[in-house]
């Protein structure tokens, strides 16, 4: 009869104790691979069981002092070249499997350069199984008799497990297998001969203190991270020979407990080591490997084999699984085989191999960055964000580094000299990883049911054996009683035999009683001795306890003293922090004030330099102006005197000819050798002054009349016309216009119309006219042909065949003198591909087609005026370079501080006093406008829209 079913005890609330605050560092182990050839150079040396030395091989660059560098690195354990897989498993993986069975997570990954033995360490080889098959063997050896039936535990898509009853599990088995209920096999399943040698069943390994009142289920999954994409290696995809499908990548998600998992990953329930390793081997065949220059079978992806152990307690009767989802404990052990870091200059990778190597190195670099940030946060107390999401590898195992299990790393090292630089980087990463601490996982919660429920229904006393009990042995030692039937009165044998037997039995009883008394006395003596020793121990313990209490009281006093001292120091620190804050604020204020003073000094210095440049420019401009004015006046005076002398000479010659010769003859051409030899400097125009309207009219009429007569070039064969007649003729033509022109009005006219004034001066000079002191226009008798000859003689000869192509790109010579001042204008000249020089030279001109000179002078308003003089560079006949100036650009900066009042036009007609002026009338002045029609092809026009206002009678 079964006992009544007891109530299930609820899961107690876990109080955060001191255990949750404990942290363990990441366990880093090192394994050295044997050399492929005995005569290879080695750069790694094992010092002891925890120290490894790395020295620079021959042929590498020496240190500054000429010695080879030797560096030692410490690990939790160093495994030499002769270490077996069993020794490595017992030290590294055995504790992780034991924690897995007790409900704790674990992470084990191998790290190293390519060809260092990571895959061998994790998987193994025929006859020498690696860590993975040994972990599976230990798990099934520990929970083999406590496993639940298949499909009792069922996984869902949310990284959790569900419990099914026996009936649902049976239906699920029949549905999936489509077979009747299978019988328990009489013998174990035979392993695949391809990997049978890797599973060594002779080496029995089992975890201790396995919970016998729980049932277990094992689920395995196998994924790979290839080019930062996650692929399921256990996914069954139907092969289509016509249109094969590429494997679909999986995504990472977060469950309700903030644990990361691969969504849609296949989880296979296994019941034995052979079955689990067969699933692993099926996925291993799909893993991406390739042949490289350094490794014949190089892993091109990171592989993750996860073992998920699900355990649930039995009910109060010990017959079935407890149907409560909250009581399920899920623990996971992830075995990660990282792809090796490699250098492309050694592997000679190209194409896809190069892309794979880049992604592998990038993910490993992200792992290293995460470790460095974790170490920095734990060492300095910072709160920097750990970049887990930069790589799928680190994002998947984020929970392990945040305190969800133990983390172990095996650093595989190849001791050959060619891998020295890569091994050095691996050692540095291992050094950083050892300093990272991970929170210790919490122990599994006890369900609260009575232990030993599994064996409660078995017969009391356990199984009966063949050995007799102690009371039966004692009874069998007595002699048996003889038969007591008396068949005859004279029977004398039965009674004596019975008496003899009873005497023997009585003797044995006395012996046993004596023995019992002796044993009782001995037991009493032992009990007294035990009591005495116990009292002595109690006294000793009491003495020790008193001593400890005294020590504790002393330590409490010391703690109180230290706490008071700590409070005092904290108060001092707080005061110092406040003082430091005040000093820092004063320092910032002083720095800001210093910066403002520096800026002010810089502005004053720049203003001073600008003022000096302005004054220097004004002085230079004034001196040049007066120098040019003096030269102009001297040249004008010389020219006037020469003209007067020439006129007098001509008159004297004519008079002499008239007096000496009776007949009029052809006058000889005067000698011009003196005038040709003497070069008359070009006079500078006088300062511009406005002209009055009357003077402008006179000058314009005079220019029209002056332009009418055309002087022809004289030759020796011309008619005999006297010079005096020519002079008189010109004087008669100029007599109506000989009114002197006001200098002030002429200057004003030139200021208003500088372009016209320049044109007049040039045209007058070409016609042979010059301005005298009386501002009279005197014609000279230089011919047009002479002017052309003089012009051709003064210009630089330029060959026509050296004309530059207009389609070719031009290059400039940017001539900026060293005395120029840097302006702060927004608009700055920008010439690409220009050669900037401070002094023009032939080398720079030979390379360019354009020339520009930046000239600065002081304007009338006191500001700096920058002129950019542009020109074309040509080759001369002599092999040199010449510049023909073509354009001038003026850059000027002014302040908009002028008067808002419009200045009246100087061309407004003067009105007599007392009359109203139409020029000042608003209606009259606004009746004229410049207008341009929308859509018109013509330019702006001068339009008149309104009638001027009538005058009052």
Swiss-Prot record:
One of its GO terms (molecular function) is microtubule motor activity. ATP binds at residues 112-119. It comes from the Eukaryota. Ubiquitinated. Deubiquitinated by USP8/UBPY. The modification Phosphothreonine is found at residues 739, 920. Residues 542-618 form a coiled coil. Residues 662-680 have a biased composition (Basic and acidic residues). Keywords: ATP-binding, Cell cycle, Cell division, Coiled coil, Cytoplasm, Cytoskeleton, Isopeptide bond, Microtubule, Mitosis, Motor protein, Nucleotide-binding, Nucleus, Phosphoprotein, Ubl conjugation. Pfam families: Kinesin, MKLP1_Arf_bdg. It is found in: Nucleus; Cytoplasm, Cytoskeleton, Spindle; Midbody, Midbody ring. Residues 681-693 have a biased composition (Low complexity). Residues 658-695, 894-921, 934-953 are annotated as: Disordered. The keyword Nucleotide-binding applies. Residues 25-436 form the Kinesin motor domain. Its main location: nucleus. GO terms for cellular component: centrosome; cytoplasm; Flemming body; intercellular bridge; microtubule; midbody; mitotic spindle; nucleoplasm. GO terms for biological process: microtubule-based movement; mitotic cytokinesis. PROSITE patterns: KINESIN_MOTOR_1, KINESIN_MOTOR_2. The modification Phosphoserine is found at residues 155, 160, 606, 683, 685, 807, 860, 904. PANTHER family: KINESIN-LIKE PROTEIN KIF23, KINESIN-RELATED. Component of the centralspindlin complex that serves as a microtubule-dependent and Rho-mediated signaling required for the myosin contractile ring formation during the cell cycle cytokinesis. Essential for cytokinesis in Rho-mediated signaling. Required for the localization of ECT2 to the central spindle. Plus-end-directed motor enzyme that moves antiparallel microtubules in vitro. Belongs to the TRAFAC class myosin-kinesin ATPase superfamily. Kinesin family. This is Kinesin-like protein KIF23. The lineage of its organism: Eukaryota, Metazoa, Chordata, Craniata, Vertebrata.
């Amino acid at each position: 009869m079964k006992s009544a079913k007891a109530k299930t005890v609820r899961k107690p609330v876990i109080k955060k104790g001191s255990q949750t605050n404990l942290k363990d560092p990441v366990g880093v182990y090192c394994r050295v691979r044997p050399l492929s050839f005995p005569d290879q150079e080695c750069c790694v040396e094992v010092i002891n069981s925890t120290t490894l030395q790395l020295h620079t091989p021959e042929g590498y660059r020496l240190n500054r002092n000429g010695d080879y560098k030797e560096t030692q690195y410490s690990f939790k354990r160093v495994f030499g070249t002769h270490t077996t897989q069993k020794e490595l498993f017992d030290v590294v993986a055995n504790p992780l499997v034991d924690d897995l069975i007790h409900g704790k997570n674990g992470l084990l990954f191998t790290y190293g350069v390519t060809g260092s033995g990571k895959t061998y360490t994790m998987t193994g080889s025929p006859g020498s199984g690696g860590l993975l098959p040994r972990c599976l063997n230990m798990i099934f050896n520990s929970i083999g008799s406590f496993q639940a039936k298949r499909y009792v535990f069922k996984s869902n898509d949310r990284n959790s497990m569900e419990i099914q009853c026996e009936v649902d599990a049976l239906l699920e088995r029949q549905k999936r297998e489509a077979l009747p209920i299978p019988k328990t096999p009489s013998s174990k399943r035979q392993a695949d001969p391809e990997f049978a040698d890797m599973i060594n069943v002779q080496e029995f390994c089992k975890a201790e203190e396995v919970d016998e009142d729980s049932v277990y289920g094992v689920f395995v999954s196998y994924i790979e991270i290839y080019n930062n994409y996650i692929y399921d290696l256990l996914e069954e995809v139907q092969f289509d020979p016509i249109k094969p499908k590429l494997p679909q990548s999986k995504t990472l998600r977060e469950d309700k407990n903030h644990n990361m998992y691969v969504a849609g990953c296949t989880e296979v329930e296994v019941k034995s080591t052979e079955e689990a390793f067969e699933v692993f081997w099926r996925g291993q065949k799909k893993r991406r490997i390739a042949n490289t220059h350094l490794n014949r079978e190089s892993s091109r992806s990171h592989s993750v084999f996860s073992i998920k152990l699900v355990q649930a307690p039995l009910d109060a009767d010990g017959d079935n699984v407890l149907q409560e989802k909250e009581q399920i404990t899920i623990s996971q052990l992830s075995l990660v085989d990282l792809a090796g870091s490699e250098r492309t200059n050694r592997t000679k990778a190209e194409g896809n191999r190069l892309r794979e190597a880049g992604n592998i190195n990038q993910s490993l670099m992200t792992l290293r960055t995460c470790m460095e940030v974790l170490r920095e946060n734990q060492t300095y107390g910072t709160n920097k964000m750990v970049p887990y999401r930069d790589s799928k590898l680190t994002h998947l195992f984020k929970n392990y580094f945040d305190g969800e299990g133990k983390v172990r790393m095996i650093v595989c090292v190849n001791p050959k000299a060619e891998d020295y630089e890569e091994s050095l980087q691996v050692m540095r990463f291992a050094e950083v990883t050892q300093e990272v601490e991970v929170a210790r996982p919490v122990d599994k919660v006890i369900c609260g049911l009575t232990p030993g429920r599994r064996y409660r229904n078995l017969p009391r006393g356990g199984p009966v054996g063949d050995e007799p009990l102690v009371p039966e042995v004692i009874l069998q030692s007595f002699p048996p009683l003889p038969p007591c039937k008396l068949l005859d009165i004279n029977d004398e044998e039965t009674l004596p035999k019975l008496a003899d037997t009873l005497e023997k039995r009585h003797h044995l009883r006395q012996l046993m009683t004596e023995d019992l008394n002796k044993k009782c006395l001995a037991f009493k003596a032992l009990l007294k001795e035990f009591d005495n020793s116990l009292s002595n121990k109690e006294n000793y313990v009491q003495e020790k306890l008193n001593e400890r209490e005294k020590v504790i009281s002393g330590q409490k006093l010391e703690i109180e003293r230290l706490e008071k001292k700590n409070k005092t120091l904290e108060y001092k620190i707080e005061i110092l922090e406040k003082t430091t804050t005040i000093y820092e604020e004063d320092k910032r204020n002083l720095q800001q004030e210093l910066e403002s003073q520096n800026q002010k000094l810089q502005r004053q210095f720049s203003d001073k330099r600008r003022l000096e440049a302005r004054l220097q420019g004004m002085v230079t401009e004034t001196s040049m102006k007066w120098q040019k004015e003096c030269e102009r006046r001297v040249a004008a005076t010389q020219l006037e005197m020469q003209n007067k002398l020439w006129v007098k000479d001509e008159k004297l010659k004519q008079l002499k000819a008239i007096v000496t010769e009776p007949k009029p003859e052809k006058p000889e051409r005067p000698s011009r050798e003196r005038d040709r030899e003497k070069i008359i400097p070009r006079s500078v125009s006088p300062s511009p002054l406005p002209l009055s309207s009357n003077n402008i009219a006179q000058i314009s009429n005079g220019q029209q009349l002056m332009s009418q007569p055309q002087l022809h070039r004289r030759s020796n064969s011309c008619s005999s016309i006297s010079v005096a007649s020519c002079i008189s003729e010109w004087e008669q033509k100029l007599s109506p216009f000989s009114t002197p022109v006001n200098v002030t009005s002429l200057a004003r006219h030139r200021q208003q119309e500088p372009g016209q004034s320049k044109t007049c001066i040039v045209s007058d000079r070409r016609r042979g006219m010059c301005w005298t002191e009386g501002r009279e226009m005197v014609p000279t008798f230089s011919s047009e042909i002479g002017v052309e000859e003089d012009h051709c003689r003064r210009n630089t000869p330029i060959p026509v065949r050296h004309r530059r192509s207009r389609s070719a790109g031009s290059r400039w010579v940017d001539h900026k003198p060293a005395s120029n001042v840097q302006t702060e204008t927004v608009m700055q000249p920008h010439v690409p591909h220009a050669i900037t020089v401070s002094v023009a030279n032939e080398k720079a001109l030979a390379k360019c087609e354009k020339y520009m000179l930046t000239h600065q002078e002081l304007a009338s308003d006191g500001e700096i005026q920058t002129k950019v003089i542009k020109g074309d560079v040509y080759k001369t006949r002599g092999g040199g370079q010449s510049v023909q100036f073509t354009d001038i650009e003026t850059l000027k900066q002014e302040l908009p501080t002028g008067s808002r009042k419009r200045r009246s036009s100087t061309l407004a007609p003067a009105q007599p006093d007392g009359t109203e002026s139409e020029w000042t009338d608003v209606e009259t002045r606004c009746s004229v406008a410049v207008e341009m029609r929308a859509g018109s092809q013509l330019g702006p026009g001068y339009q008149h829209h309104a009638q001027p206002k009538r005058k009052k009678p």
